């Protein structure tokens, strides 16, 4: 299967049908020397995402901002309040009580872009589903993995 086609199918499967239309045209794909699988995807030497062994995608904050052009992609995001914004930008986890809004497509273990006023400030891994995040007022909702302030 063509690498770009596989990447598009993966994006659509994880984040919703039609999200792959926002994949930049000029991308460079690197492959694992040992297995020959897709390893990293770059645009102008900026990392967009990494394909995980389990078939998932680890997206960067930069790529999440590109995909945010799609209204469907917003259902995979959550928005934090002003109080927690500086902590999230520094890599701290997002707690349920600081979530202002969350999309309905958030599942446990999924990559979740974290927004503040419609701008991606970080990307993390969901600890709870969207339904649980909305109902709970305590505990960690998302463990932050990548922020806009982090190098790379």
Where are these regions (language model features)?
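Beta-strand/loop-dominated core regions that host nucleotide or nucleotide-derived cofactor-binding catalytic loops
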Residues: 5-37, 43-101, 105-108, 112-152
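Short, Lys/Arg-enriched, disordered terminal segments
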Residues: 1-3
């Amino acid at each position: 299967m063509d690498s770009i086609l596989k990447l598009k199918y993966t994006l659509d499967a994880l984040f919703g049908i039609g999200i792959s239309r926002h994949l930049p045209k000029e991308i460079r794909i690197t492959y694992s020397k040992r297995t020959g699988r897709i390893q990293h995807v770059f645009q102008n030497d900026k990392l967009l995402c990494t394909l995980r062994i389990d078939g998932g995608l680890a997206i960067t904050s930069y790529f999440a901002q590109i995909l945010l052009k799609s209204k469907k992609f917003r259902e995979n995001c959550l928005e934090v309040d002003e109080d927690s914004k500086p902590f999230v930008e520094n890599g701290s986890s997002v707690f349920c009580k600081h979530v202002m809004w969350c999309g309905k497509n958030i599942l446990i273990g999924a990559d979740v872009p974290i927004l503040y006023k419609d701008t991606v400030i970080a990307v993390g891994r969901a600890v709870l589903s969207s339904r649980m995040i909305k109902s709970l007022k305590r505990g960690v909702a998302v463990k932050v993995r990548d922020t806009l302030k982090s190098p790379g």
